[in-house]
Curated annotation (Swiss-Prot):
[4Fe-4S] cluster 2 binds at residues 153, 156, 159, 204. It comes from Dictyostelium discoideum. [4Fe-4S] cluster 1 binds at residues 101, 105, 108, 114. PANTHER family: NADH-UBIQUINONE OXIDOREDUCTASE 75 KDA SUBUNIT, MITOCHONDRIAL, RESPIRATORY NITRATE REDUCTASE. Coiled coil: none annotated. Keywords: 2Fe-2S, 4Fe-4S, Electron transport, Iron, Iron-sulfur, Membrane, Metal-binding, Mitochondrion, Mitochondrion inner membrane, NAD, Oxidoreductase, Respiratory chain, Translocase, Transport, Ubiquinone. PROSITE patterns: 2FE2S_FER_2, 4FE4S_HC3, 4FE4S_MOW_BIS_MGD, COMPLEX1_75K_1, COMPLEX1_75K_2, COMPLEX1_75K_3. The gene is nad11. This is NADH-ubiquinone oxidoreductase 75 kDa subunit. One of its GO terms (cellular component) is mitochondrial inner membrane. Its EC number is 7.1.1.2. Residues 85-124 form the 4Fe-4S His(Cys)3-ligated-type domain. It is found in: Mitochondrion inner membrane.
């Protein structure tokens, strides 16, 4: 329905499709600016600040534009946003908002991007009339990551609404009323337990909530934005690195409504301090272990000669494990290297959890649904996944889905198979073993009827289930489609680690791969278990905290965001969406090389050895059609009493860059010590 109306004597129109459109939204769509503090398009309407007052004909009083919906009655009415009455009202509102606000703008971290500063300049008075003593509020502790100087707070309640409505935690609220109103936790010194708590820093229009990690370190006009991605999430959330002088000062989200809207996880927002620690403790030159815990430095020429000697030794069986952060260019280089050596013992670290692969067709491993359309699903079944820690952004997408009105109120729209976890909506817990899954396939559960009646169900399969059953992603999807009568877009398979789809596209997986060689060549992979069968370990990467004592030859390489030749590189998420990242250089040492350069040197050496590709091409022939059909008809043997446990035990310990971040590590520890925090024992810890 098209609604026509007048704004400042200008005829405008807006197309009202689904939800009611407010005056504020209509004005914004037509390029007319209306100031606001409490309104945010992703949150519910509060109407606290009253900055968006407008005049509507035939109305006695000024109206808050954020809370008045447009309808067909506005055809004969006009909206005014710039008359004297409104300008005076805005001056009065600004005066009230600034009554208790401290004059500490020069030291406030919000300076330069503060909505209060900008709107005071545009709409406020040039003199103050308040001479009574200002109210001061004590600095509040919200954990290791967020700094709360609540004297600056203007009570817009954006933070409260975000945590309650989107993050699903009720740990912030409004206490008191009138002059005594405050925003805080209901108990003192309580940490906000959410994987997305840092987003309230971006939402705060003033300097009340700021980053404790970024405090007093920089100004926004000094920082340069460089495009990046959240490498710790399979969604590959777009982010901005804010850099100055080769050092990362902040990480902020980039708006993308199809993936993350405008939110990012705490893990990617605050992990950047680990890069500074890495640069201090990492080695800049290759090194070789001569005895236990004793290394000698080598030149690159000597180190690469040792690598060639190991790789070309026919007695050695080399296993190549590539980290999940490695880009597509490097994946191709090292696959080519192993093929030239006549070996197919290569895989990525996130592929080690799977027992079988099929990457003949792209649809076998890429999800055909779209995260943007998740609000159309009327039923969700979670199988072997804890969304809160494995995919927090997908978690809030689903948690805020409007499942619609149902005639039967007792029907539960969310089912969980696997470990329980906190969920906003009412859910039905089905079971934790594979036996529950088999009952679902056989139609012996009451929940099967709900799936049958559902018009748009969504089944999400996580890595915890995929690691328990020897199935390809295609076979897993086919079983759900046949058992529950679903389409491919009704099934979403979440894998672990970034660039998994790109590695499959490059064919970097092998059927029934297992680490069985005597030489391990690890490229930026820390999650490999080094067995006693392995007598020689080559580690090429940044730093290793899992099997550092077992490394025989160390080759230092650069971070993933500086490890490519041009200015940009492409990664691909679990939905097949490609994301570009820009080159960012933070490594201090000039002797540190890119993985691509090391790989090219090795290939050039092999070319000089005049190795042909005929044998490689013959070995690359895939299974014939008959063999593939025979493989598809095989019987699957599973232990039905096997429990589907979560693969992530600690959200803040999943990567070397996370483990080296002091603030994230302490945050993880404090969550475990929740009972101690409630008792007040942690009060003496440094939390700001």
């Amino acid at each position: 329905m098209i609604i026509r109306f007048k704004i400042n004597e200008i005829e405008c129109e807006v197309n009202e499709e689904k939800e009611d459109i407010t005056i504020l939204q209509a004005c914004t769509a037509n390029g007319i600016e209306i100031p606001r503090f409490c309104y945010h398009e992703k949150l519910t309407i509060a109407g606290n600040c009253r900055m968006c007052l407008v005049y509507v004909t035939n109305e006695e009083k000024l109206l808050a534009a954020c809370g008045i919906p447009l309808d067909e009655n506005f055809d004969d009415e006009s909206i005014e946003t710039e008359i004297d009455e409104i300008l005076k009202a805005r001056e009065g509102v600004m005066e009230f908002l600034l009554i208790n606000h401290p004059l500490d703008c020069p030291i406030c971290d919000q300076g330069g991007e503060c909505d209060l500063q900008e709107q005071t300049l545009a709409y406020g008075l040039d003199t103050g009339r308040f001479y009574i003593k200002k109210r001061a509020v004590e600095i509040k502790t919200f954990g290791r990551l967020i700094k709360g100087i609540m004297t600056r707070c203007i009570h817009c309640t954006r933070c409260v609404r975000f945590l309650t409505e989107i993050a699903g935690v009720n740990e912030l609220g409004v206490l008191g009323r009138g002059y005594n109103m405050e925003i805080g936790t209901y108990k003192k010194n309580v940490m906000i337990e959410s994987e997305l708590s840092g987003n309230i820093i971006d939402l705060c229009p003033v300097g009340a909530l700021t980053s404790a990690v970024y405090a007093y370190k920089g100004r926004p006009w000094e920082l340069k934005n460089i495009k990046g991605i959240d490498i710790f999430d399979t969604l590959l959330t777009p982010i901005n690195y804010q850099v100055k002088g080769g050092e990362i000062f902040r990480i902020l989200p980039r708006i993308n409504d199809r993936i993350n809207e405008e939110w990012i996880t705490d893990k990617v927002r605050f992990h950047y301090e680990s890069y500074k620690i890495i640069e201090k403790i990492r080695k800049e030159t290759p090194s070789y272990k001569i005895q236990a815990n004793k290394f000698i430095e080598l030149t690159w020429k000597t180190a690469l000669k040792m690598v060639f000697k190991v790789l070309l030794n026919k007695k050695n069986k080399v296993d190549l494990i590539i980290g999940s952060k490695i880009n597509s260019t490097n994946l191709r280089i090292y696959k080519e290297l192993m093929n030239r050596l006549g070996s197919k013992n290569y895989i990525t670290e996130n592929g080690l959890m799977f027992k079988k692969f099929n990457y003949d067709l792209r649809e076998n491993y890429i999800n055909s649904n779209d995260l943007y359309n998740v609000d159309k699903n009327d039923l969700v079944l979670l199988c072997g996944i804890n969304l809160r820690v494995e995919s927090p952004l997908l978690n809030i997408k689903l948690r805020n889905v409007n499942f619609g009105d149902d005639e039967i109120e007792s029907v539960k729209k969310i089912g969980i198979i696997g470990n329980k976890f906190d969920w906003k909506h009412e859910s039905e817990y089905i079971g934790a073993t594979l036996n529950s899954m088999l009952k679902l396939f056989e139609g012996r559960l009451p929940y099967c009827q709900q799936i049958k009646k559902s018009k748009a169900p969504l089944i999400i399969v996580g890595p915890s289930l995929l690691t328990r059953i020897s199935l390809t992603l295609q076979e897993m999807r086919a079983i759900f489609m046949k058992a529950c009568n679903l389409k491919p877009e009704n099934i979403l398979i979440i894998t672990q680690g970034a660039n998994f789809g790109m590695a499959l596209e490059e064919g970097l997986f092998k059927e029934k791969f297992s680490i069985g060689g005597n030489v391990l060549y690890s490229i930026d992979s820390n999650e490999v278990q080094v067995t006693n069968k392995i007598n020689y370990v080559i580690y090429q990467g940044i730093i290793n905290d899992k099997f550092e004592n077992k490394i025989d030859l160390y080759l230092p390489s650069k971070h993933y965001f500086e490890d490519f030749e041009g200015d940009r590189e492409v990664y691909m998420n679990t939905f097949g969406q490609r994301s570009e990242i820009e080159k960012l250089s933070i490594s201090k040492g000039n002797k540190i090389k890119e993985n691509s350069m090391i790989g090219y040197i090795q290939l050039m050496y092999l070319n000089n050895k005049e190795m042909t590709r005929k044998e490689k091409e013959q070995k690359d022939i895939k299974l014939s059609y008959r063999e593939m059909k025979k493989e598809e008809k095989r019987k699957i043997k599973v232990n039905k009493y096997l429990t589907i446990n979560n693969i992530i035990e600690n959200y803040y310990m999943t990567d070397i860059n996370i483990r080296l971040s002091k603030n994230l590590m302490i945050t993880g520890q404090l969550r475990k010590e929740k009972k101690i925090m409630e008792a007040g024992i942690w009060k003496n810890r440094k939390c700001i």
